[in-house]
Amino acid sequence: MSQQLPVRIATRKSPLALWQAHFVKDALQAAHPGLEVELVTMVTKGDIILDTPLAKIGGKGLFVKELEVAMLEGRADLAVHSMKDVPVEFPEGLGLVTICERGDPRDAFVSNTYNNIDELPQGATVGTCSLRRQCQLKEYRPDLIIKELRGNVGTRLQKLDDGNYDAIILACAGLIRLGLEDRIKSSIEPEQSLPAVGQGAVGIETRLNDDRIRALLAPLNHPETAHRVLCERAMNNRLEGGCQVPIGSYSLIDGDQIWLRALVGEPDGSIMVRGETTGPVSDAEELGTKLAEQLLNDGAKDILDRLYADA
């Protein structure tokens, strides 16, 4: 009988969160024909507090706490996350067990008037809620005015359309998944702006002692994506980076080798600490940790200490 119990997915109500939940539901049912899967929708603190910068209210962990409580209380079996939004640490008993194949990891330049960052006039206003995007934009174009931008994807696009910004920066993956790729004027290559840790990947969190759910999820794991994301997260973990710190990273796998590039920056773009490393895929997490140590020694510690002191 236990095999016939429905699998319950905890999800926020935003269009992108629902897309991710349905994506995992469809993948589970494709892997296990006849499996019943239900969505359990809920509102998180991050969905309610929209008038305060994320960095001031605890970062993007605000978007997952309610989902985690539902799993711990047995009201849901798993939660689906954009990996760029997943906190470094999990509550006791929960963990990340599956990482699905990565989508487009790049940032998207979105504007109704301009085609790319270079076309923006002096002093143009760009919307983003990400310190990572802000520091890289300000390094490249110190003249730009960065303005806070909160809300789901549709809300952010509407604020652009209302004339509040000359351009906004979003994640390519989110726009593509919502069928809004026509809003992308240009994709920003990692060489110009490093993405967030895990950007473009979808991860699944569940109870670590739930063998049935873990077995059902196993076919959804994409090993190459998992190695890349775990490498990036190991770097972020050593830096003690939450979701609202100016940390960027990007990894690639070629054969049995993994390459990782990362940065930590002052929010105003005045100081940028960069590094890269390569090594065996089997050492992915160790490589991420070692690169973080290098960044800390090269000045990232001072940047992060100042940020955390101001938080």
Curated annotation (Swiss-Prot):
Cofactors demanded by this protein: dipyrromethane
Keywords, in A-Z order: Porphyrin biosynthesis, Transferase
Modified residues (S-(dipyrrolylmethanemethyl)cysteine): C243
This protein's record includes keyword Transferase: yes
GO MF annotations in UniProt: hydroxymethylbilane synthase activity
Protein task: Tetrapolymerization of the monopyrrole PBG into the hydroxymethylbilane pre-uroporphyrinogen in several discrete steps.
Summary of subunit composition and partner proteins: Monomer.
Further remarks about this protein from its record: The porphobilinogen subunits are added to the dipyrromethane group.
UniProt protein name: Porphobilinogen deaminase
Organism annotation: Aliivibrio salmonicida (strain LFI1238) (Vibrio salmonicida (strain LFI1238))
Gene for this chain: hemC
